[in-house]
Amino acid sequence: MDPAKELIRITARAFYSTEHVLIIDALAIHSTLNDIDLAHILGMQLKGLRRLVGRLKEDGLISVESRGEKKEGAPPMTTLGKDGQPTSIKERLFYRDWYYLNYHRAIDSIKYRMMKLSKYIESQGAPTTEKKDLVCPRCKSQYTELEVMDNISPMGDFLCHMCQHSLDPATEDDTGENENMKRLNDQLSRIVDIMRNIDSTDVPENDFDTALSHALPIDRGSSNPARRIEIVESKPSIASTKGLSTAPDQISVSVMEDGDGVKIDPEELARRREKEAKQNMLPEWISKSTISGDITSVGAKEAAERASRDAHNMGLRVEDVAEDKKLRTDDDGAMDSYWAALKAEQERQAQQDQDEEEEEEDDDDDEFEDVDVGTASAQPASVPAISVSTPATSAQVSSTATDEDGPAAKRTKVTEAQSNGTAPAAAASSQAAAAESKNGESDEDEDELEFEDI
């Protein structure tokens, strides 16, 4: 018999009821059965069968697979639209549970249960008191070696604290060994032997497809024939219903050396290498003789290796410096173009600000226009003075004129009489009189402005 199948059947007989044993035996003989056929073999209802199978499934001894089936010759299910025509066609499927023995899963479950049972029995039978190593044959007192360490005879034997008699080692019967653990090992010796045999052999995989290929049909007879069914291989899954992709993920790995894409200063690199060389340098008491001070063979070898490393690093340093110069040249050109563009932008902005300021000043000049005030020097033809009667000049004074848009303004109009033969003395006296008249008239104008009628 197959050792895996034998282990499952013996385990069922050791820990389960008769109904569970019959289910295991039926599956071991027929390889796989659905719930209807298994209920027919055992002569029980589906409800009771599913209760028994549920415990075996929970313990991992049997496995369950659901498979879609349809009756042979059954018409497809159609749905009618508003016009009475069929709109969709679906197959009438029903899913049936098939039971089989998955050897690998059952063996792992049995090993786990055995381990848990051994731990439980060991914890229950563990002694609650400390184990005694020595016993007195006279007074039957028991001691540990630590308790009688201070009472030793000249011969090197441990002595009893009560009667000072030599102590004897405790026998195996007096150590309080766990009897339950012994009994469990004796009862499970057959199962343990089969598990050891399984560990040394190769157990074949028995999944549902393999079990179905080795299935042995049952004989129902003519009085209770089985229904003819068709197997539907396509089974709805998460990938098909949710539209998920089941293709394996592709992983790409890129390996980069230390320093790839990182700009390192050559001086910093040189200092780092020099520091590492000093750390790796041999001490002087090894590289040089402590007596004569001459370099030893080990020191000479180290010096040669250091020289070769320096030569190699020097070549690398030259290449790094050339590459660094190239990078710096490119960076300098980019920076020069950037600063030139920035300077042009600043000049354009300054010129724009200056133009705006000039426009604002022009607007201010337009708003506050200068008004010229008439004076004797500015307007010699029209002098705002009161005319003075002279023998040669007649003056007409036009007094205040009222402006329609503003306050009353004092205006004077002097009309010179045209005469022939005016003397210079008369002109001088006329100018003096005009000046006095102007001063008096300006005072009157200020008074009128201060006390203006509203």
UniProtKB/Swiss-Prot annotation:
GO terms for cellular component: transcription factor TFIIE complex. SMART domains: TFIIE (SM00531). Keywords: Initiation factor, Nucleus, Protein biosynthesis, Transcription, Transcription regulation. One of its GO terms (molecular function) is translation initiation factor activity. SUPFAM superfamilies: Zinc beta-ribbon. Residues 423-437 have a biased composition (Low complexity). It is found in: Nucleus. Gene3D superfamilies: Zinc/RING finger domain, C3HC4 (zinc finger). One of its GO terms (biological process) is transcription initiation at RNA polymerase II promoter. Residues 387-401 have a biased composition (Polar residues). It comes from the Eukaryota. Residues 327-454 are annotated as: Disordered. Residues 4-111 form the HTH TFE/IIEalpha-type domain. Belongs to the TFIIE alpha subunit family. PANTHER family: GENERAL TRANSCRIPTION FACTOR IIE SUBUNIT 1, TRANSCRIPTION INITIATION FACTOR IIE, ALPHA SUBUNIT. Transcription factor; part of the gene cluster that mediates the biosynthesis of enfumafungin, a glycosylated fernene-type triterpenoid with potent antifungal activity, mediated by its interaction with beta-1,3-glucan synthase and the fungal cell wall. Is possibly responsible for the transcription regulation of one or more genes within the gene cluster. This is Transcription factor efuD.
